[in-house]
Regions:
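An N-terminal hydrophobic leader/cap segment in hydrolases
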Residues: 6-43
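Membrane-embedded segments
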Residues: 44-123, 131, 149
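Short alpha-helix in the alpha/beta-hydrolase fold that links the catalytic acid
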Residues: 82, 200, 209, 223-232
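Gly/Ala-rich beta-loop-alpha elbow adjacent to hydrolase catalytic centers
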Residues: 137-141, 145
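Hydrolase active-site cap/lid region
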Residues: 147-203, 209, 253-255
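Short beta-strand/loop motif that positions the catalytic acidic residue
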Residues: 206-208, 213-215, 219
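Acidic catalytic loop of the alpha/beta-hydrolase fold
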Residues: 218-222, 248-250
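Catalytic histidine neighborhood in serine/cysteine hydrolases
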Residues: 228-250
């Protein structure tokens, strides 16, 4: 029990509970005929980060660039397929690996990971000064995206935010997951040791740009109730909601949801 308490207490708990990085790439974008290049970034604390710049055909390039923040496990080699369709529609996408993921150095822990999102946005601003910046986050990446845009969105002129399967709070989503197992219910009271400083629902009211949120009622990882709690915290005039389909972070497998996101990008 003491070991569990040590795991859950303080910021270090977030590494164990929420981040499950993998160093090895399982595939690269060229396997899917996506042009890309390796990008190396430096976070404010000096941590070296890696990303893939996914590049569209020059003839269809859009005047928007997208910072893609993936989920809490594996790395960009398994997550980037979620956004290849955006590249095919002409959008340049920077797929970032947080510290400890893929080739990025360091250890994933909050709030340090928020510096990684900032580094990605800074690189895109410098590389594409005449393009509008959009942030897209899935699951854990959505939680990071909300925090980043709430704190730094104006500094980096972020124009739109897209969230898929976000959760409202770190404690609440941990509670939801622990309740699913017998062992989890035993340690459930220790959830209250988890810091709530970066709960997306508390940061959401500070977002004043258009936000599209997608969430499937079939999501077995992040319950739709978590997403709804976050959505309710967003400024009403800025938000739109898409009830998608499929398992966790699978909305973009469906063309109809891709088209809704594409329309949102064009309108913004």
């Amino acid at each position: 029990m003491l070991a569990v308490a040590a795991t859950l207490s303080g910021c270090a708990s977030l590494t164990t509970l929420y981040f499950h990085p993998q160093e090895i790439w399982l595939q690269t974008p060229d396997r899917f005929d996506i042009d890309y290049e390796d990008v190396w970034l430096t976070a404010d604390d000096g941590t070296e980060l890696h990303a893939w710049l996914l590049k569209p055909e020059p003839t269809i390039e859009q005047a928007k660039v997208i910072l893609y923040l993936h989920g809490n496990a594996e790395n960009i080699s398994t997550h980037s397929r979620s956004v290849f369709w955006l590249v095919e529609k002409g959008y340049t996408v920077l797929a970032l690996d947080y510290r400890g993921f893929g080739a990025s150095q360091g250890r994933p822990i909050l709030p340090d990971v928020l510096m990684d999102a900032k580094a990605g946005a800074s690189w895109l601003r410098d590389a594409y000064p005449d393009h509008s910046l959009v942030v897209l986050g899935q699951s854990m990446g959505a939680a990071l995206a909300v925090n980043f845009v709430a704190d730094y969105g104006r500094d980096y002129d972020v124009s739109q935010l897209i969230l898929e399967a976000p959760f409202a709070g770190f404690r609440s989503v941990a509670r939801e997951m622990l309740q699913r197992t017998v062992v989890g219910t035993i340690v459930l009271p220790l959830v209250y040791l988890i810091p709530s400083d970066w709960d997306p629902k508390d940061r959401a009211p500070n977002i004043h740009i258009p936000v599209m949120q997608l969430h499937s009622r079939m999501d077995e990882v992040v319950p739709v109730s978590e997403g709804q709690a976050l959505y309710d915290a967003l400024p009403e005039s800025m938000r739109c909601y898409v009830a998608s389909q499929g398992p966790h972070i699978a909305s973009f497998r469906y063309n109809k949801f891709r088209e809704q996101v594409a329309d949102f990008l064009v309108r913004g």
